[in-house]
């Protein structure tokens, strides 16, 4: 049954929490959350139901509770105009039973900082220190980035707490935004310095850029860490044409 069986509030206003109950004892067996998002797809924005909170009490696993939640929720998703649903599966085979399929792949780029030879940048870099000073620039970059890739979630203002609460000195996470000489935002990166088996590295949790100039600006920033760091690592969508962004691939 829905979280409130007497009020099927449209998903656009509230998350929807579904639960399955044991018919004899009335005990809650399983839960599924469906949260409202907007995603980019082929130039348009569409409603997407994000699946989360999938859980069953151990004694009720494999008892059909999750299946029952999906059987009730999916028709309402259709009725409310949802085009997509998205989740991180604990089992690909299990969720294929409900029509889910793998749709997102990405690269993990690992670049040797000593090999970076970016052109000198005529722009500037700004370090986030909390507050919303960089919020307009980073939101602009996110909107451009999201428009390039299918299934990218359109970020709301509430999604930027990581930026508003930036504290590089205490958290040791560094968020830099790159700007052109004219003051246009080119890219940004959020990273930590981590000791790993292959060296002391810059490990990015977020990296966005606009065009070749944006990528070059971030590489210019990273190259300044080459004296005491070995690699920079960052995730990218698999369709990003890395071979055109890096001028030299040979390390011979």
Task: Label each residue range with its predicted role.
Residues 120-252:
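Intrinsically disordered, low-complexity, positively biased terminal segments
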Residues 78-83, 89-107, 239-252:
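Conserved active-site alpha-helix within GNAT-family acetyltransferase domains
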Residues 70, 75-89, 227-238:
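Conserved GNAT acetyl-CoA-binding A-motif
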Residues 51-56, 61-78, 211-223:
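Conserved acetyl-CoA-binding loop-helix of GNAT-fold acetyltransferases
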Residues 19, 26-37, 50, 55, ...:
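Conserved beta-strand in the GNAT
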Residues 38-45, 111, 196-203:
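A short, polar/charged loop-to-alpha-helix boundary motif
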Residues 102-119:
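Flexible glycine-/small-residue-enriched beta->alpha junction loops
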Residues 1-41, 150-175:
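Active-site rim helix/loop that mediates acceptor-substrate recognition in acyltransferases
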């Amino acid at each position: 049954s829905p979280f409130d069986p007497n009020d099927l509030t449209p998903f656009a206003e509230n998350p929807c929490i579904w639960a399955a109950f044991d018919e004899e004892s009335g005990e809650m067996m399983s839960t599924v959350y469906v949260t409202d998002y907007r995603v980019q797809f082929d130039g348009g924005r569409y409603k997407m139901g994000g699946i989360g909170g999938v859980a069953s009490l151990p004694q009720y696993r494999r008892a059909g509770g999750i299946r029952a939640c999906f059987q009730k929720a999916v028709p309402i998703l259709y009725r409310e105009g949802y085009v997509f649903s998205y989740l991180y599966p604990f089992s690909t085979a299990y969720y294929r039973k409900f029509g889910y399929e793998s749709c997102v792949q990405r690269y993990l780029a690992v670049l040797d900082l000593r090999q970076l030879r970016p052109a000198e940048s005529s722009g500037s870099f700004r370090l986030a220190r909390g507050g919303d000073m960089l919020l307009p620039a980073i939101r602009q970059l996110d909107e451009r980035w999201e428009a390039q890739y299918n299934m990218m979630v359109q970020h709301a203002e509430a999604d930027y707490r990581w930026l508003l609460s930036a504290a590089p000195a205490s958290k040791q996470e560094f968020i830099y935004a790159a700007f052109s000489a004219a003051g246009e935002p080119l890219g940004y990166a959020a990273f930590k310095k981590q000791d790993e088996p292959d060296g002391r590295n810059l490990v990015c949790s977020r990296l966005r850029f606009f065009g070749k100039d944006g990528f070059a600006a971030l590489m210019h920033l990273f190259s300044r860490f080459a004296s005491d760091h070995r690699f920079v690592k960052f995730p990218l969508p698999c369709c990003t044409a890395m071979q055109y962004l890096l001028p030299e691939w040979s390390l011979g």
